[in-house]
Swiss-Prot record:
This protein's record includes keyword Ribonucleoprotein: yes
Gene3D superfamilies membership: Ribosomal protein S8 (1.20.5.1150)
Molecular functions per Gene Ontology: structural constituent of ribosome
Gene Ontology terms describing biological process: translation
This protein's GO CC annotations: ribonucleoprotein complex; ribosome
Source organism of the structure: Nitrosospira multiformis (strain ATCC 25196 / NCIMB 11849 / C 71)
Keywords linked to the UniProt accession: Ribonucleoprotein, Ribosomal protein
Pfam families: Ribosomal_S21
Record carries keyword Ribosomal protein: yes
Annotated family: Belongs to the bacterial ribosomal protein bS21 family.
Name of the protein: Small ribosomal subunit protein bS21
Length: 70
């Protein structure tokens, strides 16, 4: 479990921001969202494959030269 110690005379907003940052670094929220509902193994594989294809196309697009505008 993630905990932070609130320092003396520290505003609540600053402590909340530090807490959110630590939660984000641990990846807890993304895991909670992923585990919120059951996902069939086939659906998970399909989602991961689609993400991999999208990453590949994005990488290829950044390597290609832009089209000529004349």
């Amino acid at each position: 479990m993630t905990t932070i110690k609130v320092k003396e005379n520290e505003p609540f907003e600053v402590a909340m921001r530090r807490f959110k940052r630590t939660i984000e670094k641990t990846g807890l929220l993304t895991e909670l969202r992923a585990r919120e509902f059951y996902e069939k193994p086939t659906a998970e594989r399909k989602r991961k494959l689609a993400a991999a294809v999208k990453r590949t196309y994005k990488r290829l697009r950044s390597q290609l030269l832009p089209p000529k505008l004349y």
